[in-house]
Amino acid sequence: MRDTNSSKYSVTDLTEPRLIKKLYELILKEKELGKHGWLRNVDKNKNLSTKEFKDIWSEWWKGPLPPSTEVDIILIFEDPMEVIDKALIGSIETEYFSRGDLNKKNFYVGLQQVLAFSIFGFDGLSLWHVFSPEIEENVIENYTTTVSELISGFKLPIFYLAVKIQNKEDFRLKCFEPAKLEYYIDWLNNYWTVETNRNPPLQRNEIRNRRNLLKTILKVPV
């Protein structure tokens, strides 16, 4: 997916659930076209606290599971580095900003959710902020610069992507953070391939056990 891409979908009256569905469909379509060589699977709206999740955990491991959470988009890549094994499992939290949301949502919204994903054993963590067409670019730059400073200041291993939907007639995106970025999924994969950008809690055995459970639920065979 790149910032000049377009879709047949209109973004009139776009809501966050619809945005997630559109992004999922675009990524899946590009995967089917062979545009992302290391991408093996895409999932969306995955609840990590279902009965199936809890039952498998209680059967194989001890200790409580974290509270309920849902991941907007999950990307599963083949990991050429094999840092843990052949799979690289990434989580994406997506937040949509309409003009009305600017007075309701904090600039850092979604960051706490991404950090929560880390304790479930994801290899990669990512936050996407998507801004509606009517929001001025100086406002977007103020939001994204502040979030980037927060992430870099604390050296959080989170890939932050901020884009604006160009217009309401097609799904065309302009990237603000990282600047002039194209081919988002490939950049995401490259970022997560670097071992120091991986999820730090994976050094703990308990988190790796949760990752094994995650692989089972997502049907990752490697």
Model-derived features: where do they sit?
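Charged, often low-complexity linker/regulatory segments
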Residues: M1-S49, W187-V222
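Short, charged/polar micro-motifs that form catalytic or ligand-binding hotspots
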Residues: Y9, D13, G63, G100-F107
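Secondary-structure boundary elements
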Residues: K29, L33-G34, P80-E82, D123
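Active-site metal-binding core of divalent-cation-utilizing nuclease and nuclease-like domains
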Residues: H36-G90, N106
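Short, flexible loop/turn elements at secondary-structure junctions
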Residues: F77, E95-S98, F131
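Mg2+/Mn2+-dependent nuclease catalytic core
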Residues: E82-F122
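Nucleic-acid nuclease catalytic cores
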Residues: N103-F107, L115-F171
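Non-catalytic C-terminal interaction segments of nucleic acid-processing enzymes
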Residues: T145-V222
